[in-house]
Amino acid sequence: MSSWKDSLTSIPGTVAQLINESASNLLHASSTLGSTVGLGGSGSTGSGSEAGGSEESGPQGAEYRALPIPASLVREQWRLIFTSDANIQDLQAAIAHCRDLVLLSEELSEERRWLVRHLVDLRYSLQELEEAQEQHSLSSDMVVMNAIRAVVGHHFVPHHPHHGKRNRLQAAAKRNYCDHCTTIIWSVVQNSYVCSDCGFLVHQKCIDGVKRVCAHVLVSERQHPISEICPEIGLASQGYKCAECGTMLNIKNTWIEPRLCDYSGLYYCPRCNWNDSNFIPARIIHNWDFSPRRVSRTALQEIRLFLNKPLIRLEEDNPKLFVFVEKLCAVKKLRQNLVHMRHYLAACKIASELKLVDQQLGVRRHLAQSNEFYSLSDLSQVESGALSEFLQGVFKAFNDHIRSCPMCLAQAYICEICSNNEVIFPFDDGCIKCDQCNSIFHRVCLTRKNMICPKCIRIQERRLQLDRMKSTEDDDDDDDGVATDDDVTAAE
């Protein structure tokens, strides 16, 4: 039984090998080229043969590892898993079949998760194979060198830290370590690859044994950072094994001691948890605590990918923070003003030509689109005060344009309570906006009216008047259509 399970877990989960080998065949290269990671190995061919012994792939003949295929999909593996002999038609058929299986599988199940990841790999490999056919004019060495290796969601590209004089000096002062074997990467004599999505750095020789799923895949599936503070489940629930590589953990031996990740609440071995420190999103949201805590390597990469994504509804998750944290309250007020300003700038042709919003906000347009969403980087800058300074600079630039632009001034308001000729805007200090009719008044003036908007009163009176007129007309129509007693008597 154990050998049967091992044969299932050894089924690779990527198809980059068939890309490079097919490209080499197209270019009539020698069979010695192609030290690539692929979906070959101990897999099934597209003709329907069952999974057999491991097949050499690369100079070392190493066995490629990936996520184990779910037991319920074993009978479908011959239609999903291919060796390097597969062509574009085989991949297209596998993509169509895998897509159908995704629709038939249950939501949030292990089968659907495996199928979605495998579908991404198939589509990515199909694209690479099509591009390889288009590059038939390139030499085989160039194709193999530029090949992207796909392993458990990672997209590994060659790592070149010595390009440029400045980069060479920086690389000499900084040591890079392999995320798989934890040893130093000597860039002068050793080739290395880096994942273009999550930054996973690895020796070329270690690519075959990578087990960690790409953090970019995990972020795409989870969509939000973990909201619980250190959701620990205990070593017993993990079977006293590392949550990533499955190494048996032992408290007595330091080289295999369990290390707790404060982000995921799981225990890892020293190779998967380097005691890196980082702030924890859940502790920021619930406790406004930015103290660095020890996290695993995969958690560190995941937090970095979440860093600039505006996904946190802070006022919904913890509304009392805006009461106790003055910096947060000030930032909220600035963002509310920027939201009002954006409506003026969106309708201004001059601001559109100047690209004022893009120039001031860049990729952080969410700061002026609403005041609900925050990123981890935003919250960190709120604590340091950098975000408040940034928003004040943006506010000044927007305010200068609106008050000097004739198109924006044409949309200004005048307080109808005090009849002052001074124009006012909803983002001015001392002004307030009616939530019903969007009219702008001086706060002092509206306070004297007991916070009752005069425009809303006029609208309500006009609506009542129209209702009375309509009811009167309906009564007249009824009188014209119904005969009275006098009319009946006269007719007799």
UniProtKB/Swiss-Prot annotation:
Keywords: Metal-binding, Repeat, Zinc, Zinc-finger. GO terms for molecular function: zinc ion binding. CDD domains: C1_DEF8 (cd20819). This is Differentially expressed in FDCP 8 homolog. Residues 38-51 have a biased composition (Gly residues). Residues 473-492 have a biased composition (Acidic residues). Belongs to the DEF8 family. The keyword Ribonucleoprotein does not apply. A zinc finger (Phorbol-ester/DAG-type) spans 161-214, 400-453. PANTHER family: DIFFERENTIALLY EXPRESSED IN FDCP 8 HOMOLOG, PLECKSTRIN HOMOLOGY DOMAIN CONTAINING PROTEIN. It comes from the Eukaryota. Residues 38-62, 468-492 are annotated as: Disordered. The gene is DEF8. InterPro entries: C1-like_sf, DEF8, DEF8_C1, PE/DAG-bd, RH_dom. SUPFAM superfamilies: Cysteine-rich domain. Gene3D superfamilies: 3.30.60.20.
